């Protein structure tokens, strides 16, 4: 993944959150007592509101959590990493393409192929889209990139967390969607290609002036442009991105470059499943696969843990290996992603983009 900014701000501490909560409860209790004394019925609670002030009415509790097999997802991850580095244009890159396709046999799959003109020359790019139809009019996109950093192609860098963990996550989500009729929106799983910059992007002591701005996100930018041209973009209700979600010390950032109301839905899904302590403890601004869709007015949420080791020390280094990842982290993010989809299915209408 590539970063616009690594600015992070800490959310209020737990102690302050408890104090604020206690004050709010005290005020609510006083209002309730006042209404009761006057023989009035307390007003119903207002719907949750996002940081822009737009009201968001969430579906009620939807029952048992969705299934997600984290051990199987972890096995997919290990098999992807076993191919070795998978930079754009390399033999291992093609092997991972074929591996993903082999796990989607029998599913409706669209191949989006084109040639990208990059600072390193022209390269074939291959986006893979698995489509699971629903009864409601609209599409929820769940995305992950699968390539590894091109400048590190001659090292042992395998991108276990960056590109590997999220690609494995989507394969297991496909298992949970497969063969189960959907009453909600259609879900399209996208393994997008050529996300990483072809030139050094400032990580690992490389020159910061080598910016990602015109040298990354090739696959997802092409897809956003294509879907804008053929009318698909208007049908997309939400774009959910997973990136760097396998860290054993999982802390998903609140991305300030995402859509506030959709991030709030993700937070609600985490809360319902008891995983809220792993979400939104920090704010961040991330330039990631969702940006081309955000720019075109699609509601987006980037689920990313951009603290991979102390001060993100393992990111874009050969130390990004499977031993630092956990099936439990895959379980948390996979379950929250599926619960988010369930909540979105029941929200009618969805907030404005």
Language model region names:
Residues 56, 64, 92, 115-117, ...:
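Active-site-adjacent substrate-binding region
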Residues 1-13:
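N-terminal secretory signal peptides that target proteins for export/translocation
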Residues 26-29:
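C-terminal motif of bacterial Sec signal peptides marking the signal peptidase cleavage site
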Residues 156-265, 285:
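Acidic/histidine-rich catalytic neighborhood of metal-dependent amide-processing enzymes
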Residues 49-95, 310-324:
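N-terminal capping segment at the start of a domain
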Residues 80, 112-114, 132-134, 143-147, ...:
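Active-site-proximal beta-strand/loop segments in catalytic clefts of secreted hydrolases
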